[in-house]
Every structure is written in structure tokens, then in C-alpha cells.
Amino acid sequence: MKTNNQLKNENAITLIALVITIVVLLILAGVTIASLTGNNGILTRASDAKIETAVGAVKEALKLEQGEKRIEGEQLTPETLLAEGKVQRTVQQEEDGNYYMYYALKNNAIEGMQGLGKGNIVELKDVFLIDDNLNVKYISNNGKEYGDTINNKILEDETKIRFASKAFSDYVSKISGVTEEEMKFKWMKNQTSLTITDSSVDSLQDLVFFPNLTSLQLGTNSSDAPQIISMDGVENCTKLENLKIYYGPDKDYSTVEKLDNLETFYRYAGTDYNNIIDGLKECKNLKSFSVISQNITDMSRIAELANLESLDLRLNQIEKIEGLENMTNLTDLKFDFNRIEKIENLESLLKLKAIYLTSNNISDITPLSANISLTTLDLRGNSQIDGERSNYTGQRLVALDKIERKYKKEFYNKF
């Protein structure tokens, strides 16, 4: 007996075959590819019709929900939809220098979206936007717009801001010295750095009102770390360059991949190393990566962060150096307090200037002779290293001499 998944797959294959057959028949009938796929082509018009139908269905669903709210003596607005978890916000600075706030429907939040609206709210692609009058506009991945003209909501310096999270609102009120009722966009707009040290904060959605942040820190110790399990909201901080996270629960970092300007990432404690790699592997400008005290045993996924210059994996359980063979931009490595027994897979790192290997299980340092740019080497706490020159012969002695000559002043090996 066939499973539902098998039937779905067969139906999908049948549909694809049908579409291909129709296209072939149309071509044989003299219909050109341009007339199929051009701006006014059959397929383009079919796609437009689907989108216009979806826009109409969403508008109708909102009207029905609005009617239900009125019966209950309430109103339906983007803010009430936000409170219900059906809408997300983004703040964009446009070419005129003004900041505009947009409300976008979340995926499948309203009946009739037909699989649309799964896109990037920060880039305003594949999104349904609504305004205070419940006008609906859909923006496709190619930037084409469908539906209503929506009223842009300008955020001026004196615009009062209402946060979605009460805990976040309380914290901002405390650090700004402004009551929640008097919070205005100007203060948030002017912040380039924000540190959140309140364990009651459990959401970053309100970072939408901090469009100019370049540095964000969550927590300083285990008692003040925000209880955030998802980094959703941080994608609105498109200028963010530095992100530091101390303690707190393991997190979903999927939205971090949208931070094109992120250069430095630091995480202390937790066990979310793989989640971090999943989220940061698309951050092509990431230069410095630190994940400390996470009991990491396998570091091979570091290879997915190809452009790193500095790597810090102190206080873990790493036994083997791996994944660095093609990371030729690395200049700084910190592996203190791990279980590394062998210096290996570093030969290609010709730009490497510093390596810290305090308190590991290393016995042979001669492989470091290949790293011609190395000027700083810390091997303290590796008691297995043989300090007797007479025990070195052949190529190992040549390598040792090379290291000693290079580090006449800088090299120290207190073991």
C-alpha cells in the first residue's frame, strides 16, 4: 500500500510532466518561448493571476476578521495582529533619509496566502504588507508589486514607540531613563551599541526599532543572561558588526545569516555550536569567531566559515585540529585548555602569526616550522614536550632549529 508521501510525490511528478507536455505542445503549435515566459507571456500571466487571487483572498480574510472584532467591540489593526503573532515589523531607511515602518504578514498567518509570503522581510521580497487601513500589497522576489497602495508609516524622532515585549520595554526604560509611555524613536535610532543584561528578556523582536546598531551583547554572566532561544529580530539590525552572547539557553541562529556586515561573533557557554555554524556560514564578512566553553569535541565544521582570520575555541574538549586546511586567511588561533595531542593540518596557514595551545597534551612542536609568519607561540602547560635538544635528530632537529631561530625573542615554552 502506498504511503501519503509516495502519493504526493507521484502527484507532483505527474503535474510537472503535465506542465512540460503542455509547454512542448504549445511550442509545437508555434507558440514561442518569449510568448510563454516574457512579461506578457502565458506563464507570467498565470503567475500574476495566482498572486492577484492570493492578494484578494488575504484582503477578504482580513475583512472577515475585522467584522468579527467589531462584533466583539474591538478593532483589527496591524498592532492587534502583531499581538496575535500574525504580523512582524521592519524599519527601513529609504533614499529620502526617513525611516519607515512596515507590517508584514507572517507565513500562513492569514487564510488564502497560497504559499506566498515566505520571503525576507528585511529585503521586502516575497512579502504581504498591510497598513492601518488593512490595505494589502504583495511584493514578489523580483520586486514586482501587486494589490493596494499602502500608506507608508514614517518614524520621526518624536514618534512614540510601543514594544511588543513588556520585559524588553521595561529594560529599555531602565537603561534610557525614560518611562515606557514617553519612549520615542529618536533615542533608539541613535543607539549604535546595546547590551541586554536582564534574564526576564526572552525576545529580540523589538530590535526592529534599533536600525543603527553595530554592536549587540546579550548578558555578562549566568545570572543576567537573557532567556532567548531564538535570534529572531536581530535580522533587522542590518548594520550589526559585532555580536556577543554570554551564557543563556541554546539558540536558533537562523536569522543571523541575514547579517551581511557581521564581522565578529563571540559565544561563551552553552551547547549550541552546530546551531551557530548553521546560522553563520552565510555571513561572508565574518572575520573573528569565538565559541568558548561548549564541550566541543569535533571542530571540523569550522571549515564552513571560510573567511575567518581569527579563531578562538578555548575551554572545549577538542582532541584533533581539523577543518582549517583551506582557511588560508587565518592569522590567530586559540586552542587553550583542550585535549589536543598533535599539531597538525596547519601547514597551509602561511599567514598564521599567533597560536595559543596552553594546557593541552602536545608532545611534538616541530610541525610549526612550516608556519613561516608565526611570531607568537604559547605552549605552557604541555608537560609532554621534550625539552632535551639531544633527543632531536634528522628533520626533527632541522625543524626545531628553525623554530628556535625564529622565536629567539618571542618564543616561550614554559612546560
Question: Residue spans of the language-model regions?
Answer:
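N-terminal capping/linker segments that flank leucine-rich repeat
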Residues: V136, N141-D224, D232-T271, I276-S290, ...
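Membrane-proximal N-terminal amphipathic helix
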Residues: G41-Q75
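Periplasmic/extracellular, small/polar-rich flexible segments of pilin-like filament-forming proteins
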Residues: G67-E156
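Asparagine/serine/threonine-enriched low-complexity, disordered tracts
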Residues: N212, K239, N261, N285, ...
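N-terminal single-pass transmembrane signal-anchor helix
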Residues: N11-S35
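Ankyrin-repeat and related helical/solenoid repeat scaffolds used for protein-protein interactions
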Residues: K334-S383
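N-terminal leader/signal peptides at the extreme start of proteins
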Residues: M1-I13
